[in-house]
Amino acid sequence: GFNRIYKLFQSKSFFELEKRFSIMWMLDVSHCFDSIYTHSVSWALKNKAYIRKHVTNSNQFGQELDTLMQRSNNNETNGIPIGSEFSRIFAELIFQRIDNNIELDLMDEHGWKNKKDYVILRYVDDFIVFCNNESNAEIISKTINVKLNEFNLQLNKNKFKKYSRPFCTSKTGLIIKVNELIQNLESKLYEKHDGNIVLNKIRNKHDLKVYMINNIKSICLDSQASYSDVSSYLLSSLSKRL
């Protein structure tokens, strides 16, 4: 897997998927963490019928997680805290059940096999669908939404992003521009001679800082992006060069 979604778009596997499939849809779960119902972790680990049958048994793992999550969030059952590692693990338990349900439904209803007839990738609450025609993408997205609904979640249809080959997302374009800026910065900071790195003298550190900040602002403005869209890639790239 990838711990940052931008790493997917730079990976060998992404280009292999682009060779195999002509359609890519990006889908987003609406208000994901705010909408997660804490009891649904028990449904994910077992199923609703089992939980109802054993509702008085309070020492089940799912119920223990449910109770712990409620206590971390003022005893609320609707919504989980955003940002904590526990919340990410809690959500992942639910989403892995949803992933499995989607795959089973597409096989049972349409005879489609994952990684053969289509591929669904997921990064937290973002689904990326690869297939070979719009009608199949529509069926897959509807199936995803139905299976999300079973856990009181739903897709944000205002955030559907649809691409046909070649796949060039706004994120891809953003990363290309940031990478060019970093390479330009490198040329200002040092040069390579016979395999050795020679540091350049920075005559005005303030001017260099302003140059970087203004260029990042310009990239975000041109790409209609925010600092949060570029920060993780920028920090990762800079840390590798320090």
Which residue stretches match the model-derived regions?
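Conserved two-metal-ion catalytic palm core of "right-hand" nucleic acid polymerases
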Residues: G1-I82
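Right-hand nucleic-acid polymerase module
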Residues: F15, I23, L27, F61-Q63, ...
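Glycine- and acidic
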Residues: S22, N75-F86, V124-F130, N215-I219
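Conserved pre-motif C helix in the palm subdomain of viral-like polymerases
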Residues: S30-F33, N75-D105
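Amphipathic alpha-helical scaffolding segments
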Residues: H39-I51, Q96-R97, T143-L148, Y163
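Active-site palm subdomain of RNA-directed nucleic acid polymerases
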Residues: K53, I89-V124, V129-N132, N136-I139
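Helical (often loop-to-helix) elements that flank the catalytic cores of nucleotide-handling enzymes
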Residues: C131-L155
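Conserved catalytic core of two-metal-ion nucleotidyltransferases
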Residues: N149-N184
